[in-house]
UniProtKB/Swiss-Prot annotation:
Species this chain originates from: Homo sapiens
Record annotation: effect of changing residue 757 to A: Loss of polymerase activity
Recorded catalytic activity of this chain's protein: DNA(n) + a 2'-deoxyribonucleoside 5'-triphosphate = DNA(n+1) + diphosphate
Protein name: DNA polymerase delta catalytic subunit
Cross-link (Glycyl lysine isopeptide (Lys-Gly) (interchain with G-Cter in SUMO2)): 574
Amino acid sequence: MDGKRRPGPGPGVPPKRARGGLWDDDDAPRPSQFEEDLALMEEMEAEHRLQEQEEEELQSVLEGVADGQVPPSAIDPRWLRPTPPALDPQTEPLIFQQLEIDHYVGPAQPVPGGPPPSRGSVPVLRAFGVTDEGFSVCCHIHGFAPYFYTPAPPGFGPEHMGDLQRELNLAISRDSRGGRELTGPAVLAVELCSRESMFGYHGHGPSPFLRITVALPRLVAPARRLLEQGIRVAGLGTPSFAPYEANVDFEIRFMVDTDIVGCNWLELPAGKYALRLKEKATQCQLEADVLWSDVVSHPPEGPWQRIAPLRVLSFDIECAGRKGIFPEPERDPVIQICSLGLRWGEPEPFLRLALTLRPCAPILGAKVQSYEKEEDLLQAWSTFIRIMDPDVITGYNIQNFDLPYLISRAQTLKVQTFPFLGRVAGLCSNIRDSSFQSKQTGRRDTKVVSMVGRVQMDMLQVLLREYKLRSYTLNAVSFHFLGEQKEDVQHSIITDLQNGNDQTRRRLAVYCLKDAYLPLRLLERLMVLVNAVEMARVTGVPLSYLLSRGQQVKVVSQLLRQAMHEGLLMPVVKSEGGEDYTGATVIEPLKGYYDVPIATLDFSSLYPSIMMAHNLCYTTLLRPGTAQKLGLTEDQFIRTPTGDEFVKTSVRKGLLPQILENLLSARKRAKAELAKETDPLRRQVLDGRQLALKVSANSVYGFTGAQVGKLPCLEISQSVTGFGRQMIEKTKQLVESKYTVENGYSTSAKVVYGDTDSVMCRFGVSSVAEAMALGREAADWVSGHFPSPIRLEFEKVYFPYLLISKKRYAGLLFSSRPDAHDRMDCKGLEAVRRDNCPLVANLVTASLRRLLIDRDPEGAVAHAQDVISDLLCNRIDISQLVITKELTRAASDYAGKQAHVELAERMRKRDPGSAPSLGDRVPYVIISAAKGVAAYMKSEDPLFVLEHSLPIDTQYYLEQQLAKPLLRIFEPILGEGRAEAVLLRGDHTRCKTVLTGKVGGLLAFAKRRNCCIGCRTVLSHQGAVCEFCQPRESELYQKEVSHLNALEERFSRLWTQCQRCQGSLHEDVICTSRDCPIFYMRKKVRKDLEDQEQLLRRFGPPGPEAW
């Protein structure tokens, strides 16, 4: 019998879906693709070094580094920011792009042109940013105080203002929550002004309002509460005051009043600011104090659209955990921290640093620094952060793991100077728990690490919020967006690598560097930073709000800005979940398979267009009976399909229509500039801007419909959807009435489906070109029947088209060229859904390709039958059977038992550290169990299934996963009854392989008996064959040896595939990436090899005649 072969490449090896997947003739060890990239980065960086500046910059930074923290030899001059020249505040302005605006309460500072500083504490706004030259800036903005409004009660005059201020001050000082630690008056001023509420059209114009200015932002809430309860005013009793704009954040209030938007450029004019040269409060290179009214805000247009050379740092850590236990900061050490730094606008990282515990072999293209003590390692990284001074910090899951782990570990080891990771001197970074919940994402429990002055952009959180994927592991998203795989090492194996030698620690460092490099690649590829900067500019909110807050603050900011120009105020509404409203219209689909072109007509920006066309806004809403009371004529207001009334633009133009007009016209300008622009960086900015403008316009409608929100208005949201339903129905009627045989067309048109903002029309023509021409003609003709700016546009043609049901269809999409389809488009089908196993998506996609592209229904049916046969005979790889579902809430909060929830609970009992947590996607497969056992009890971890050889419930996958999707596709073609008979019954379903597991059930009590390999007869001895098959023993032996050889060859191919991916052909494969099908295949073949070798041993040792 042959011995086990050495793993090596074989002929016909399929390339792995990774970089470096080609086979070489020799298997000599060579660097991985990532290591070659690192070396190339080093060469590119060497070309840009400025040798004459290095010594000067190095000396300046060493003066600020505490003795013993980082040796001078360990600091690379390239880490440092350029040294700013001397700046004269009297003659030179300070111009910088602000990235973050927050506030603190502290002692007042003297500023040029400002009043003498008061003795008590005052709120100071703080803007962090970067200049064009790359210098870091912190600007302290003084003199701005928080305020809010309230309507003046009847009879209130100037003589009552002093009395109200005294009474409110007294009430706040007595208040248990508001009056603590007050050193001066809480209310600074009460002023009379003329304003108008934005909610509803009243017809009487502005009315008296009180503007109440308080000393500190935290005093707004108690002042509002006490005013709502009632404050005594001499001669007026104890009236109650309704608050307006009392729920606006202090930073938003300041930015609205000064016309500052997120991430725009600010200018401190010469002579108007003071530089702090000594006693600086931050670690920024330039620190200034200025009066709030002297700050100049540049709109992000033209040259002010540029983005400063921001410093982006991506990092990853590795910990040495104990076997079977996820690392815990109280017990398990941090063994490596790898960092990559990028200057925005440059092609490659300028900084590649690996900090390791214990010696590590050199890595070409990266700087390696080793430490014997973990405390020194942690302190070195903390000092490195302060030296490198990043503006943006990114990574993968740094928010919930890396940063909290580092801070907790430093506390455990009592590294007192570690947690100063922000830009404010002496301010520790701390950890707090946070929870976010929405209808779209469910509940997510996260941690928040404060790092004042630096923007945290965790790529995992970005992807969870912006993209719907089957898996969110770094490996899965890297393949999905970058087409790259990475080695994925289990936390228990990391400890073995650390305890090895300097070469194994080098392998771990390369792995850690790549884990830091990939988030940086994702940040660039998905334009995350550029898009976030442009969204902050468009909506006017600080960058951090986009990453940590919901959608509503973006619309509130725009609403406040527009309202301020018109003297309107936003009321504080106590929102409670109210009544729901009818959504968009869906025209009943005419189901079937269409072998003729189907033209799709789409309303451009439907909901924003409706709001602009019909002037739907808070400011134009008429309460029931108001139109008659104000004497409005029929041509001065409209009645919507839902019965609500709004005044027309001739009476008052609404705020929301004005905001939408500005957004959409700005988008049109951005797209026009984008078409002409050639500079790649500027193209990125413009593309991000037009996308931000589009998203912002579409979110305005959602803001009005949010039942629990800042300013919900059911009348607006239900009127918008009411008009939408009416327009879809009218479009159907217009198309079907014009394009008829009676009007001279070859056939009469029919609308086969309509959904929200689009209709699908069958014009009866046979060619795509004719359908396109008629679609464009129909879109122009129908648009003329609707008020501007509502416009119906021709979008695409489907040919052929498979219409299955509401929101479920597929077809070949033609949008520009009639002679070549763009792609196969699927909506609502399992080909694009992520709540089924990959087998479903792959089979549905393959079937659709055969039906729509190849036009081969028989081939599609045959392929589906083959896959079903393979499934029932256990020939499908387990990676194709993995189902993933998100854990959105605790087990007790689910109404019924869920498979992924129950599995998460079982995994938590096995290993609490590595069990899924809220917000994670849980992978599982369904295993066989006794008849009648519920599906949620049969869910199991795929790796656990492989390790314990548990049998898969193939019948479940056929009936619960494959059956319905396949019938939906094939019934329109084969007919309802025939589709089921052909696909789910027949010869291909009669042959089944039933496997038995090694553990559980009756097998725990059963005694195993050997069977004859030839005829399966139960044997009474330990041999391989029975007496009847003895003459065929040699033949049977050769057959099993051949099977073993085939398994060894398959294992060899898979093993070498994985070696290629990890970048070494002479090291063991330790990757355990559950998102890679090769991993499951390799585990399965290894198990099959062990079983086959055990079977061959039953034949006994070869006799002398074999030699």
